[in-house]
């Protein structure tokens, strides 16, 4: 990710990866990082330079393992292929944006991770708060919330009328089960056997404690069927939706 205005303050080039790792070690006041993520892919980044840098950081002890985040399945496959061919450190975990509102990773990313033995730790299981059902369709979001602040990323992704309506249906089902919509959503992610764990993103201590309570809820087949009915496997909650930060690149018009 970009961490400044300089030309070498972003991307997956060797200089920036090395510098960013050293900066992280200094800020964390530690000798090594357990898992160092390539947080997003830059498809024009030299694959060999990127992967060999991760291997160098591993061999010199600055990181124990590295992972991939927001990588397309074909890029995951390319990284694994290069690592195997050149006997360098392999990625051990993938961090996709995956929740009951966005099931697109089920098409290629999750099967690829399973095939290559890569752990999966999805982020944003609550769809930036939408799956807590605290946002009512047609009602202004509460002050102090992410939507209430008109967060740009949320407004261009999760905060859609279709998603808000689905969250209310999940809430009604969850309450009949004696739990909350948020707890249901977290457990839905964990109920996928391909997933290793899940990344929680609480903003307050109360939110963190509420995350932990989610583990007390036992997911069942009826919950799985509900989400399948509301959001078909492999699809987002809104037909035709795609995150503008991660556009599809499979069409290059000859004339436009």
Regions found by a protein language model. Name each.
Residues 143-176, 191-195, 205, 209-256:
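Terminal-tail/helix-coil boundary detector
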Residues 60-61, 116, 177:
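Helix C-cap/helix->beta junction micro-motif
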Residues 105-145, 180:
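Aromatic-lined glycan-binding groove of carbohydrate-active enzymes
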